[in-house]
Regions:
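Hydrophobic, small-residue-rich alpha-helical packing segments that form membrane-like cores
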Residues: 109, 114-123, 139
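Conserved short loop/turn motifs at secondary-structure junctions
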Residues: 99-110, 265-269, 389
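Structural preference for beta-strand elements that scaffold enzyme active sites
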Residues: 57-62, 102, 124-125, 154-156, ...
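Active-site and substrate-binding clefts of carbohydrate-active enzymes
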Residues: 1-21, 138-440
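Short, solvent-exposed turn/loop segments enriched in Gly/Ser/Thr/Pro and often Arg
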Residues: 64-66, 102-111, 131, 298-303
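His/Asp/Glu-enriched short active-site or ligand-binding loop at hydrolase and phosphoryl-transfer sites
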Residues: 124-136, 295-297
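N-terminal catalytic cores of secreted or lumenal carbohydrate-active enzymes
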Residues: 1-64
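CE4/NodB-like, metal-dependent polysaccharide N-deacetylase domain
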Residues: 78-105, 243-263
Length: 440
């Protein structure tokens, strides 16, 4: 559909050279994306990631099963957080055939005690926001520029604020450059519904075809110049490299080998910041030629520096103001009593049937766990707070809880509606090999 739309755009803009050039660019980009995804990788991107991982070019780590906010879940019951961690670990093992070294804490959300669950999952390291390490007990001797081991074992690395600000901030950082593509100006809102055709499907929405650059903070936007945008990305990559080298040089004067950890949401690169992948490629290529410092991973750093300080990190997130307010305020706090009731019921059912169960009981308990895990996704609370899709987020979470409750009530009454169970299994079929015994 997008290829067809850009072909129509090529014809529509044939007398407008700059717009025609942009239409050609999008036609070529979407055509190449389709060739790569369909022809080269047979619609199986996991195989591509497996190849990159096995060749040593990419380290992939695990995360919680459905991006549940672990500090809140752990406060409800230990089993709630434990299942998120261990199911996430199990999925990683199924996909890659080995246990993960690292673990991404959703929203970098940490509370003391979580590391015991990570240790149970055999995780060697995780990432905190800077204040999680800085306010640890005792204070870290090397600030945020070296990891610290937690009392239970796994090492905690801290996010570097300087590099995060330079890349993440749309106002202070690179993505706000006037040459870069404007995210919010899209032909999905500019062109007629008839011309958009199947891309629109009857409603206005982002199509991914955008002809304008950021230009400035006003509403007037100039046409996008791809060459100028790529040049800006290359300059920013050079600047980022120079800033990191200056940082490393200054820190190294204190007599240790520092690591700068720069984690970002993947959606920044290519989605919000269209030129982000160009920036990454330029930075990686330039760094590959450096002799003064190099790219590394937390696993490689720990292997080279096995002796580090032991501290208890502080409760922290990378959300607004560094705590849980985004996911726990008057707009969304009501969800947690529902989630707590559900996990208590899940744990009771799991304990009752932990030793032995029939095939139908196993199916029901797996589906109850799926619905609970899906209801626990932190995205729902985030969207309620952000007001961007509050109704959708509320409906999604309540639908999962409604299916959980209906199925649980049938289970307790020994009156399973197998047609309803099959419908639930068809709707929510994530984690086919899920172990519900983690709730015991």
């Amino acid at each position: 559909n997008l290829i067809d739309l850009t072909a129509r755009e090529q014809r529509r803009n044939r007398k407008h050279p700059q717009l025609r050039e942009l239409a050609d660019f999008y036609f070529d980009m979407f055509s190449e994306d389709r060739r790569f995804f369909v022809d080269e990788w047979k619609c199986d991107l996991l195989s591509a990631f497996r190849e990159l991982r096995s060749s040593g070019r990419l380290q992939i780590i695990a995360s919680a099963a459905t991006h549940g906010l672990l500090p809140i879940l752990q406060q409800q019951t230990l089993q709630a957080a434990r299942a998120q961690v261990l199911v996430g670990r199990d999925v990683y093992v199924e996909l890659f055939g080995e246990e993960p070294n690292g673990f991404w804490l959703p929203e970098c959300a940490y509370v003391p005690g979580l590391e015991t669950l990570l240790q149970e999952a055999n995780v060697r390291w995780f990432v905190l926001d800077a204040h999680g390490l800085l306010f640890g007990k005792p204070r870290p001797c090397r600030s945020i520029y070296a990891p610290c081991y937690t009392p239970s074992g796994p090492a905690a690395f801290a996010r570097d604020r300087d590099s995060s600000r330079q890349v993440w901030s749309a106002h202070e950082g690179y993505p706000g450059d006037p040459a870069y593509r404007e995210f919010y100006r899209d032909v999905g809102f500019d062109l007629s519904m008839q011309h958009l055709g199947p891309v629109a499907r009857g409603t206005r929405k982002f199509s991914g075809v955008k002809y304008h650059r950021i230009t400035g903070r006003g509403n007037e936007k100039q046409l996008y110049d791809r060459a100028a945008a790529k040049n800006a990305a290359a300059k920013h990559a050079t600047h980022f490299l120079e800033q990191r080298w200056q940082q490393i040089r200054e820190i190294s004067e204190f007599g240790f080998d520092p690591i700068i950890v720069a984690p970002f949401d993947a959606e920044l690169f290519g989605h919000w910041w269209f030129e982000g992948p160009v920036f990454l490629e330029e930075f990686i290529r330039r760094t590959a030629n450096e002799r003064k410092f190099s790219l590394t991973t937390p696993s490689e750093y720990l292997a080279a520096h096995p002796t580090e300080q032991i501290i208890e990190p502080a409760a922290s997130t990378w959300g607004e103001n560094g705590h849980l307010a985004v996911w726990l305020d008057q707009s969304n706090a009501w969800v947690y009593s529902h989630l707590q009731m559900a996990v208590q019921r899940m744990s009771a059912a799991a304990r009752t049937h932990a030793q032995s169960c029939s095939a139908i009981t196993d199916r029901v308990l797996k589906q109850l766990a799926r619905e609970l895990l899906l209801a626990q996704a932190s995205d729902w609370a985030f969207l309620m707070k952000a007001h961007t899709a509050r109704e959708y987020a509320t409906k999604r979470m309540m639908d999962h809880l409604a299916r959980f409750t209906r199925l649980h009530d049938q289970f307790v009454a020994n009156a399973i509606d197998e047609e309803f169970l099959r419908d639930c299994e068809w709707r929510d079929n994530i984690f086919p090999n899920l172990s519900w015994r983690y709730y015991v």
